Amino acid sequence: MKYWEQGKSCPVVATFGLHPIVFALSHTKIAWEHSELDNVGGVIGGPLEILRGPLTGLPIPASSEIAIEGEVPPPSVESRAEGPFGEWPGYYSGGTLGTGEPQPVIKVKAVYYRNDPILEDEAPLWPGAVKIDANPASGILWDQLESAGIQDIVGVYNHTPYLTVVAIKQRYAGHAKQAGHAALTCSAAARNGRYVVVVDEDIDPTNMKEVLWAMMTRVDPATNIDIVDGCWSTPLDPRMPPSKRESKDHTNSRAIFFAVRPFEWRDKFPKTSRTSRELREEVVKKFGNVIPFPKG
């Protein structure tokens, strides 16, 4: 924006065929003014090798299969209709269709490539929200929750941007509500969301079977669901009404489910009829080659 505000073109680099962790961190809400490339190094266990673009001076991951250097003129100077695309929610969206505006263009100045480049692509997929087996946003959200003063968090998981689950060991009345509303507002989960679920420490937040069981047995719909309106959303939201999209009011509502034992009478809550996690793991390990135990 600082270039466009001065009427100048903004130098850019577009890279293709990246390490999957580079892609994962590129759209993760890390701390402001922190480098995504530095965070990649922290995840892969060593510095990410980069080159400086000869024309722009911008960093280019050295393992990229293709890299393009160029500049983006202000949209008022040049822009074009684009899209829609098969986006992560599982619908055709984005581009001009999503924003109602023409999109910026890149004036290509140089192209660098490997022979026979291998590209990592995604066809339009349904039901959407396909993920690689790396979820840095969950760890970042956990850190942000603890920084916000939320105590005794035992697990955090973003199943998709639409569903965040936080497991806590309840310490005081209102603890679950505090955790749920904090998860809703921390930057790692604030945008594109729909549902937040708070569960007790006996529930594995990564296991949807356990999370759904907690929601079905510990949530009283009249008292354990909070609705929060006016939250940070995106033009890619398929449920956004046309009127809000046209006025560029890219906000939505969220639901927070408190799927926990009520703190005030948690000691009187029925005991679960399940063996301990440790015993289950021991049995599966001992008899797994004989009995086809269901996963999860």
Regions found by a protein language model. Give the residues of each.
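Core active-site phosphate/anionic-ligand binding loop and the adjoining beta-turn-alpha structural block
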Residues: 14-18
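Charged, compositionally biased interaction regions
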Residues: 19-296
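Internal mixed beta-strand/loop scaffold within catalytic domains of large alpha/beta enzymes
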Residues: 1-13
